[in-house]
């Protein structure tokens, strides 16, 4: 057995509801999660079409600049029209489990597993010799070329297999955590009597991740003939409900991988027939499940499975795996854990930065938005030209950005395949795109955050991010698409000066310091062909910039952008067209959907129709003084060094604290 240390004291966690639903949701009365599923390919349907009003909860700050929704997806906040409120700033959520000790309610004792006792030096062979792992699983690992276990697998396998407690594990992405929770499921199936009922349920936040876990299960089964008798089925929205019933009846699976909505659908329809013998429920990417808004659905799944179980309502073990463990994850764990004792396994050193140490990180800093979007296209084109074997992923904030910028990259990188991937695609199209990208020796995938978590493409060399991610946490998950399974990888984020606040957030919250910093000087580069590409389709450029403005509005609560951010995007239209007199056009009624109603910003747009007088920036400014700065003679904003030191003219150096 292993040694345990540090029994945590229980404490209650108070939650506050999320306050910024999409304007579309309010207009049509659709719940936040149902609308999210409808737009972005996540599974929130129930059998009778009921709506799961699983509002996001926790201490994440809602957007204070409220405007109607955009095409943002996968963890991005929407907003509604209304009065601006003073931004409260982004202090960031603390990772309570890592810094204060993971704790649950008064009925559950949390036991922290010591690293050295969890089997840090374990190998597949030693686990077989100790009777922890079966020969079948050992042969499966050998046939797949896995002679060693990853650190995450070494720390988690023995605690899971040698106890009957619930388990919460914190692990970085790309560290082999999927295999770490699948091997115990197969081990228990090998040890138990034959059964035609479901013995384990694995819940994933997205269809793509569910499909990936299902494929991993099939690879394990195909690697050893004795494992093939344990069938598995994947159930997710977007697929035929009738076909799901047929698969359950025909295959009689022992393992079910599902997204929450479709799982509830099947439990309501045929739970007593197939789900009465469940021993395990696994929540993969638990933080993502909560960010999307699945908390109530997960609690309902837990209640149904407990009620159906023949061995009692407290029989099912819970394995919860997450890259981050904030108060929201602790609250979820507290509501779905069945056993009196929960093991907490933290595979991340609290003094270690949250990103994978195998990933070389870099930031390219540009003066403004126009230079930043130009720098990203220019730099990635040059890298693809210099490295014909480049295999990379480029993350953009919105669907429109993926389609517009991605097609520009396709026109610039003639010899490199460029694929587009986002939540607006059908599930079949998404599956075929990922299958094609995995099979490529070289190529570039341009995508939204739908691919940021859990998606495994083992040979990605470089991850690029254009602008700030939808949340600072997503920076960690995005770059986790490279440097997987012990390989080396590279990451580059392109930022305008007004976006540098994210570097400070990453440093304070995640202990991530990007020391490799480069300033992009547009004047020193030959960019005529790149700038010409932006001017070929003015309408699409116009739409692209408006969607970026809307994204900024929705992310205001995360980053507390200065007014200069909106001014920079507004001026980008004329800059990219090569004509400073060109302006973006906005309806007065929709003005505050995209920008704060401030003279310094509004003067840069062609505004059609009257501006809604009730929608204001929050003050009347007759002296042209801004709440956090003032306008200089040229109309640019000057900022207080105390509050917005990152908004100054930036010269990159480590001494700046980034």
From Swiss-Prot:
Q: Return one GO MF term.
A: RNA strand annealing activity
Q: According to the UniProt record, where is the region Disordered?
A: 40-104
This protein's source sits in the domain of life called: Eukaryota
Please provide an example of a Pfam family that matches this protein in its UniProt record: DEAD
Q: What is its EC number?
A: 3.6.4.13
Q: Where is this motif: DEAD box?
A: 284-287
In the UniProt record, the transit peptide is located at 1-35
Chief subcellular site? mitochondrion
Could you tell me which residue ranges the Helicase C-terminal domain spans? 372-528
The UniProt entry, under SUPFAM superfamilies, shows: P-loop containing nucleoside triphosphate hydrolases (SSF52540)
User: What reaction does this catalyse?
Assistant: ATP + H2O = ADP + phosphate + H(+)
Task: Indicate where this protein resides in the cell.
Answer: Mitochondrion matrix
Broad enzyme group: hydrolase
What is recorded about the protein's domains? The Q motif is unique to and characteristic of the DEAD box family of RNA helicases and controls ATP binding and hydrolysis.
- Spell out the PANTHER family in the cross-references: ATP-DEPENDENT RNA HELICASE DBPA, ATP-DEPENDENT RNA HELICASE RHLE-RELATED
What is its biological role?
Answer: ATP-dependent RNA helicase required for mitochondrial splicing of group I and II introns. Also required for efficient mitochondrial translation.
Provide the protein name: ATP-dependent RNA helicase MSS116, mitochondrial
Species the sequence originates in:
Eremothecium gossypii (strain ATCC 10895 / CBS 109.51 / FGSC 9923 / NRRL Y-1056) (Yeast)
Quick one: which gene encodes this? MSS116
């Amino acid at each position: 057995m292993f040694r345990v240390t540090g029994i945590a004291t229980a404490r209650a966690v108070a939650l506050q509801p999320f306050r910024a639903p999409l304007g579309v949701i309010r207009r049509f009365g659709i719940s936040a999660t149902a609308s999210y599923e409808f737009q972005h390919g996540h599974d929130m349907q129930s059998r009778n079409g009921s709506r799961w009003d699983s509002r996001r909860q926790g201490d994440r700050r809602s957007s204070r600049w409220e405007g109607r929704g955009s095409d943002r997806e996968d963890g991005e906040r929407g907003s509604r029209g209304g009065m601006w409120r003073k931004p409260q700033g982004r202090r960031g959520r603390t990772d309570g489990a890592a810094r204060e000790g993971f704790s649950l309610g008064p009925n559950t004792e949390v036991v922290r597993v010591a690293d050295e006792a969890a089997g840090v030096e374990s190998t597949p062979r030693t686990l077989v010799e100790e009777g922890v792992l079966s020969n079948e699983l050992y042969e499966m690992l050998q046939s797949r070329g896995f002679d060693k276990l990853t650190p995450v697998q070494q720390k988690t396998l023995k605690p899971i297999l040698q106890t009957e407690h619930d388990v919460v594990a914190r692990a970085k992405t790309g560290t082999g955590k999927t295999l770490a929770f699948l091997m115990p499921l197969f081990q228990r199936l090998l040890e138990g009597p034959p059964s035609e009922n479901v013995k384990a349920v694995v819940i994933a936040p997205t269809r793509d991740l569910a499909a990936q876990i299902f494929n991993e299960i099939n690879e394990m089964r195909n690697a050893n003939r004795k494992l093939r008798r344990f069938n598995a089925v994947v159930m997710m929205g977007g697929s035929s409900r009738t076909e799901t019933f047929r698969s359950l009846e025909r295959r009689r699976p022992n393992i079910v991988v599902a997204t929450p909505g479709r799982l509830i659908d099947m439990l309501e329809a045929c739970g007593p027939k197939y789900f009465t013998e469940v021993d395990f429920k696994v929540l993969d990417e638990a933080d993502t499940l909560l960010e999307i808004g699945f908390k109530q659905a997960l609690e309902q799944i837990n209640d149904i499975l407990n009620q159906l179980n023949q061995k009692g309502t407290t029989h099912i073990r819970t394995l919860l795996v997450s890259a981050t463990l904030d108060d929201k994850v602790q609250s979820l764990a507290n509501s779905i854990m069945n056993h009196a004792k929960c093991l907490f396994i933290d595979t991340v050193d609290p003094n270690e930065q949250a990103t994978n140490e195998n990933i070389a990180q870099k930031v390219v800093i540009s003066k403004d938005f126009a230079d930043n979007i130009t720098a990203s296209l220019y730099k990635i084109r040059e890298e693809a030209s210099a490295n014909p074997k480049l295999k990379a992923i480029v993350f953009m904030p919105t669907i429109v950005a993926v389609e517009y910028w991605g097609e520009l990259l396709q026109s610039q990188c003639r010899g490199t395949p460029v694929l587009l991937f986002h939540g607006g695609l059908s599930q079949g199209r998404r599956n075929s795109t990922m299958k094609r990208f995995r099979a490529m020796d070289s190529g570039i995938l341009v995508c939204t955050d739908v691919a940021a978590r859990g998606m495994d493409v083992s040979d990605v060399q470089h991850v690029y991010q254009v602008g700030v991610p939808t949340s600072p946490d997503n920076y960690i998950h995005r770059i986790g698409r490279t440097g997987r399974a012990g390989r080396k990888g590279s990451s580059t984020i392109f930022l305008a000066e007004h976006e540098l606040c994210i570097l400070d957030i990453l440093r304070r919250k995640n202990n991530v310091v990007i020391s490799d910093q480069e300033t992009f000087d547009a004047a020193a580069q030959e960019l005529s062909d790149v700038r010409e590409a932006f001017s070929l389709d003015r309408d699409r450029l116009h739409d692209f910039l408006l969607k970026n403005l809307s994204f900024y509005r929705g992310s205001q609560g995360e980053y507390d952008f200065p007014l200069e951010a909106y001014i920079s995007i507004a001026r980008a239209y004329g800059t990219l067209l090569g004509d400073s007199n060109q302006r973006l056009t906005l309806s007065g009624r929709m003005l505050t959907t995209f920008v704060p109603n401030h003279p310094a910003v509004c003067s840069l747009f062609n505004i059609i129709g009257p501006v809604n007088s009730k929608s204001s920036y929050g003050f009347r400014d007759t002296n042209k003084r801004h709440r956090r700065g003032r306008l200089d003679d040229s109309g640019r904003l000057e900022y207080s060094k105390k509050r917005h030191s990152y908004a100054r003219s930036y010269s990159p150096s480590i001494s700046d604290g980034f």
